[in-house]
């Protein structure tokens, strides 16, 4: 039987050879599927074939058909390789055998690759094509799993790391698992090594070609998998011990950071961003952390801080911060019952449920969300419903009542506030006491108390609504020996009530500072308003008291003289006479005048404090938020405004300061007059004649006209309209997301009443309740017991150290053992400290020794739902061009597999026919021999 030419040999000759037997039929069957890589127009030069060397038939139709098929195959190859293929010749360093091997690996010709790997011992499996890619890279790029597995069995295979990164980027899970089973990843060190570290070791493990790597030099497999949101691949890498190292602090001055910054600052910044992209990936957050909610919240805040530090990458960091926030919102959205919502909002549910009968969720995660401005998380319906149930604690029936009923409840609480306070003093654990401890009742009680305080401020000025009874140039006394200042500086009963309210509010603020700490207290702007209001009230009352004290001293001098009966008939000394003068004759720095001025400012701030409770209402809440944003815009605008204002004020003053008394008015002649004129010019209340001079100095006057006109154009037309545009933009931002903004502001208001304590409103909080005294005694007892235990523990440690010293002194065996045990304990302590720092990122594979708590079970359920939802969303995306290309590659690979199966079947059939023919030919011979 004639054999076909060598399976891997080039085509020779110009006419088709006639081959007999099964081999000819086998080659004919491959004529339509295994084509040459090129075909000339007339001649037939030596061409590489994909499969076994085909025999051509002599008919013109068959030759024409083959040419058309080859041209189609060639066009597909050009399309796959891109335009660069048309401008790059085949590498002269490659043999025809290597070219055929690379083509077979690229197009999924499994039979050829297997046969060449088995039979061609001189084949270089690391040979590269015109683009510098070897067979492994080509097979992975075209998703040929079987070829990848065949190549991975070869020793000294290069660029395995780049193939892994390529498979991760394309999401080929099975290929990734196959590559990870390679001996190079047995120890796990390669997974933690980036391409840049491999280059330092002069290793081409992650190299794409001789020029460098395919991906960024700092990208490790786990970082790339996190970037691509490949959950299954991330899980596989995590199980093999891969982790993403958190970048050092931005201001870190360690030797490693300094070296990277000096060598290439841009690469250092990009490596930090790539690491944070991996850490902020939902795939990595959900699979790597024991507490993904806590990790995501902390990371979102860290990224927001970096966005303000690294301005050049601000958008990247803000996007990553928002990605972490969206991840937390996604987990909250997947909750199906109250227990799961509580687990996300509180953290470890079991620990906090063990607090006692009066359990109230601590909402530790929600505190962080409010602190880090995760507004969508706080405003989520699941979170809001949980907050609403806590808000109406012990008053669940009031939640469904109408607004009229709620208003009546508020009115009843305001009227009966003294009675409710009395009940809570003596029976804090009664039913009424529990109702008073509820957040809603605390809010109503505090709001009613503050409303009464504002009413007192109004009533304190009610006697002057129709005008003061004593004119500024008049004096009035109750009796003949009384000084006028004794009547005006003494405190009325209304003012004494106001002082009691102010002292109560100061005490409440002191308790809040003690509870929260100074840093957290100053973080809230409303606390700054309260602090300013109370400080001004206190300064006003102190100044008023000083005026009263000085007047009392003068009055005591009068009272000590029994001969004085009527002050109007005697001449008083200077130290006494002043306190009997009319208001218009008082010193400008008189304590009572200062007190009245400060009191007026404090009253304005007190009424502005009403805005704090406006977020409780859906109608007024967005308006209050817009007002707060407007105030921020005004402060930003004031920087530019002050620069322009001061420039023109100093310029106009320098121009007109020499013309005092020579102008039609005093504008711009002094700094004070310059300020007044320019300030009121903003509102159109300054006159044009402010720049006119009475003398014939036209040059100065014309310059004044020009500067004054430029000022009005700049301030009124440009800057004021810019301020209006800024305010309008801020209001539109609030309006576009009004529901989220309002719910977030309302949650912040509610949260201030969720904490234990501050049950009694002002001024009833000044009287210590029996409950407070009881808790104070308990704390003192606990402190004293801890103090004695500390001394006792210190004595025990001293005794133990003495024993050890005696053991060393007398040479007792085991002293070295004790020292080794002590050093071991120290090492274990240091190790536990480091592990606690990394606990939020590392897996704790101790579920067999430490069974998971309820919180861990809940988080595991939520993470499963999140991963499944992410996979469903990914699968529901439309088929893109890359997926169509993958389908083509699969069809191409299937073609070669079918051909191999057909060839094998043909060989088996030919063998059966041969055996059958031999058997049939042997039967006549046996019959003849039998005869």
UniProtKB/Swiss-Prot annotation:
Could you list this entry's UniProt keywords, alphabetically sorted. ANK repeat, Calcium, Calcium channel, Calcium transport, Cell membrane, Glycoprotein, Ion channel, Ion transport, Membrane, Phosphoprotein, Repeat, Transmembrane, Transmembrane helix, Transport
Where the protein is mainly located, per its record? membrane
Q: Which SUPFAM superfamilies match?
A: Ankyrin repeat (SSF48403)
Query: What Gene3D superfamilies does its record include?
Result: 1.10.287.70, Ankyrin repeat-containing domain
A single cellular component GO annotation: plasma membrane
Briefly, what is this protein's role?
Thought to form a receptor-activated non-selective calcium permeant cation channel. Probably is operated by a phosphatidylinositol second messenger system activated by receptor tyrosine kinases or G-protein coupled receptors. Activated by diacylglycerol (DAG) in a membrane-delimited fashion, independently of protein kinase C. Seems not to be activated by intracellular calcium store depletion.
Protein name in the entry: Short transient receptor potential channel 6
List the gene name. Answer: TRPC6
